[in-house]
Amino acid sequence: MALNKEDILTWLEGAKTMEVVDLVTAIEEKFGVTAAVAAGVGGAVSVGSADSEEQTEFDVILMSFGDSKINVIKEVRAITGLGLGEAKALVEAAPKAIKEGLSKSDAEELKKKLEAVGAKVEVK
């Protein structure tokens, strides 16, 4: 049975965060692309002059957990609502997006929380 776009979207709606993260990672590895590049290209195509517009959505990227792996895992669990195993896998897979599509103020607040427990974080 061939899957169509609607089948995939229906599955994504019911999928857990880690299932989606695993899917994105598998797509990145299989096709040699990154989600960040694909999003940037799509935005540039849909907007005539992307350079002149100010960015309104930001992603919080965990670059590394530093010396406080356990505290970072706890904070990631609190932020994302993931289970212990899922949060641990996400932290250990750094650099990885913790949250995407946030306002600038929310992204900066999240960055401060993660840095307070020893993580190295970027907002893109």
UniProtKB/Swiss-Prot annotation:
<dbReference type="GO" id="GO:0006412">
    <property type="term" value="P:translation"/>
</dbReference>
<dbReference type="Pfam" id="PF16320">
    <property type="entry name" value="Ribosomal_L12_N"/>
</dbReference>
<dbReference type="InterPro" id="IPR013823">
    <property type="entry name" value="Ribosomal_bL12_C"/>
</dbReference>
<comment type="function">
    <text>Forms part of the ribosomal stalk which helps the ribosome interact with GTP-bound translation factors. Is thus essential for accurate translation.</text>
</comment>
<protein>
    <recommendedName>
        <fullName>Large ribosomal subunit protein bL12</fullName>
    </recommendedName>
</protein>
<keyword id="KW-0689">Ribosomal protein</keyword>
<dbReference type="InterPro" id="IPR000206">
    <property type="entry name" value="Ribosomal_bL12"/>
</dbReference>
<dbReference type="InterPro" id="IPR014719">
    <property type="entry name" value="Ribosomal_bL12_C/ClpS-like"/>
</dbReference>
<comment type="similarity">
    <text>Belongs to the bacterial ribosomal protein bL12 family.</text>
</comment>
<dbReference type="Pfam" id="PF00542">
    <property type="entry name" value="Ribosomal_L12"/>
</dbReference>
<dbReference type="GO" id="GO:0003735">
    <property type="term" value="F:structural constituent of ribosome"/>
</dbReference>
<keyword id="KW-0687">Ribonucleoprotein</keyword>
<comment type="subunit">
    <text>Homodimer. Part of the ribosomal stalk of the 50S ribosomal subunit. Forms a multimeric L10(L12)X complex, where L10 forms an elongated spine to which 2 to 4 L12 dimers bind in a sequential fashion. Binds GTP-bound translation factors.</text>
</comment>
<dbReference type="InterPro" id="IPR036235">
    <property type="entry name" value="Ribosomal_bL12_oligo_N_sf"/>
</dbReference>
<dbReference type="GO" id="GO:0003729">
    <property type="term" value="F:mRNA binding"/>
</dbReference>
<dbReference type="GO" id="GO:0005829">
    <property type="term" value="C:cytosol"/>
</dbReference>
<dbReference type="GO" id="GO:0022625">
    <property type="term" value="C:cytosolic large ribosomal subunit"/>
</dbReference>
<dbReference type="InterPro" id="IPR008932">
    <property type="entry name" value="Ribosomal_bL12_oligo"/>
</dbReference>
